[in-house]
Amino acid sequence: MTFPDTKSFRSAVDDQGVATITLDRPDRINALTFEVYGELRDTFRHLKEHAPEVRAIVLQGEGPRGFCSGGDVTDIIAQLFSRDMPGLLEFTRMTGALVHAIRTTRPPVVAALHGVCCGAGAVIAAACDVRFATPDTRMAYLFPQVGLSGADMGAAYLLPRIVGLGRASELLLGGHFVDAAEAHRIGLLNRVVDDVRAEAHAFATKLAQGPAFAHAMTKRMLEYEGHCDFTTGIEAEAQAQAICMEHPDFLEAHEAWKEKREPKFR
């Protein structure tokens, strides 16, 4: 497949259908600029609409110091002081659009975190479906440390659903760092492993070998059912599963079971 042209990160797809997106500003701990936000947003939108061959995504950061240190102080923060309200809203809506693009892209997204993961970088990690990290990972939602609300880029929506309201409140009000062990204990991280890239890619490959249509449906239902009551959710799942039962992958799984072979999902 062809990715949109980007300057701030690298991207590639392997023969299993796993796309790897690597933030590539290691000298700035992969800090986010206006350009990075826009390119990432457009890439995840592209993966949703124009890349059916991509079946899973790994998001990682280059360099030894960390996954992402958040917004670049020079490129973004300093410039925001000269913007009026419409200009500020243009920026905050763009950052939110990136998180929306990650959450709503069709393939599952696996974050491979290491070192520093803070501010906007920590929100991007929270937007991924699964988060793996090295033992040296440190995460923080630093917004209150710079006089801003912890509710930024969807953090106040995402975190309570991941770690619960109480812990989300502590993280977003306190703005303090938590280490990998604590982040794993509270559910912010799924796994803590030494070789995070290998682990993340192995998991993404397993997902890529699975039923892409059903995985996309699962993502959609997890999002939808966060907004509805239990009765509505049960009915939504009934309809979703009936739709999956009409998909060729359901029959393929059954035929593979009868023939004692691995299924070949579409």
PLM regions with names:
Residues M1-Q60, H100:
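Conserved CoA-thioester-binding segment of acyl-CoA-metabolizing enzymes
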Residues F3, G61-A97, C117, G147, ...:
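Glycine- (often His-adjacent) and acidic-residue-rich active-site loop
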Residues L98, I102-T104, A112, C118-L172, ...:
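CoA-thioester-processing core
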Residues F132-T137, L189-E235, A242-P248, K264-R266:
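C-terminal long alpha-helix characteristic of the crotonase
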Residues G175-E182:
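Acidic, divalent-metal-coordinating active-site segment for phosphoryl/phosphodiester hydrolysis
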